[in-house]
């Protein structure tokens, strides 16, 4: 007897859960800008040196790396009535929202106090981030009854992730200018609160309304890997190669996301509000190309299309190196080109 596929409701609610990427985008795009604003940003003052900010970031990432297998193991063993993955999302959601907001209300009594604040909040942020993101992504194999379900869940996640990332990249520049009314710090704080509430709402919609326990009841009796066995798989050759490629690509992707604000303000010499236009071009191109990329990938293989998309992205980013205030009009088609590359490389590669 053929396995019954998942309902449209399940796909929709699962897709809502990746709204934590709104918080991820705010973190990557606006945190550095807030603590290390460009010199022509008159209402913000540098709060940390680049070196101290990097050390604070590294501390958070170390926490993330250390907790990931532990959270995976604990969620595998969970017997919560809400579902073993949803339970951890519920635990991590509110701390994730609170810590993101606290980044933008730092201690300012001294540079060391600010550094310790950022390092501490960063560690707590990534603890909460791991509690949400790890179990959420683990839902795909738990929920899928068939190979088609698995592909569809991955596609839904990628589509929603693209949409949520676009929302968090395109709209904040406008809201910061509008809500700040000339005060960038005030605008950033109010915008962060607004988008954090929006982002975390989707996480709780997914956690409470997915009905994970009901959908995975027949699977929870399956034997799960021991922690030491999970760690052993993590050091296999194929896993290391995949992780290295994943790490290198997303390091570059996060750099691109993180420098957009600086690029618009310092290189193109435009206002923060202009970031809305640039981000709309970048993610608009990615959104338009995304379904086309998917069809081409099925026809010619994901590997070939992924290589082509990365090549397009490389050409676009190299071109951006030669943009100045005098020829800044060239940045617009180059960001569109980057968006075309991102349509596959950033949103198909994780599948």
Residue ranges and their predicted role:
Residues 1-351:
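Membrane-embedded alpha-helical bundles of multi-pass transporters/translocases
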